[in-house]
A protein has these predicted regions:
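Hydrophobic, aromatic-rich alpha-helical transmembrane segments
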Residues: 22, 26-30, 34, 54, ...
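Terminal transmembrane helical anchor/hairpin motif
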Residues: 57-142, 146-150
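Secretory targeting signals
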Residues: 1-45, 49-50
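A structural motif at transmembrane helix-loop-helix junctions in multipass membrane proteins
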Residues: 34-70, 74
Length: 152
């Protein structure tokens, strides 16, 4: 996430644009990317704690990733299937929504209409990091109770 933001900063400072853009507006999306990475690291650790084979871990996590992506795409594209998007872990990964609106980017909750609220940038990050930490806890419990095979 830091490398992505540094690349954005470098690009903005080496290219001439019609309207100047400050690199600091890209900090919330970079933090959202970090939170997604933290969740995926926790998920992968949790799956890895329960299996002996790297290929199986990669297959399970890759399949989960692909299914989650399909669920989010179908939830956005198919009328009447919007609810399906909420079953994906990509739901709190919305870096594009955090670029243009600083009040949304730096808040836990954001009022979209009177009486209607959505998660803000900090809320998105909290959900992803919280799920990642929960996965790490599950991984620790599973690994502590697991019978490891003897070395060959």
């Amino acid at each position: 996430a830091c490398a992505a933001w540094c690349g954005t900063w470098t690009g903005l400072n080496t290219v001439t644009l019609e309207a100047p853009i400050e690199a600091r507006v890209f900090v919330p999306p970079a933090l959202n990317l970090f939170a997604l990475g933290a969740f995926l690291a926790g998920l992968t650790t949790m799956v890895s704690a329960g299996t002996n084979y790297r290929a199986r871990t990669i297959g399970i996590v890759g399949g989960f990733y692909a299914v989650s992506m399909v669920l989010k795409i179908v939830g956005r594209a198919a009328p009447g299937w919007e609810w399906l998007g909420y079953t994906s872990f990509f739901t709190p990964f919305e870096p594009q929504r955090l670029v243009g609106d600083a009040s949304r980017a730096w808040s836990v909750w954001f009022e979209t209409a009177p009486g209607s609220y959505e998660l803000g940038g900090i809320g998105y990050d909290s959900v992803l990091i919280g799920l990642g930490l929960a996965a790490y806890v599950v991984a620790a419990v599973v690994f502590a109770r697991r019978d490891l095979p003897a070395p060959l």
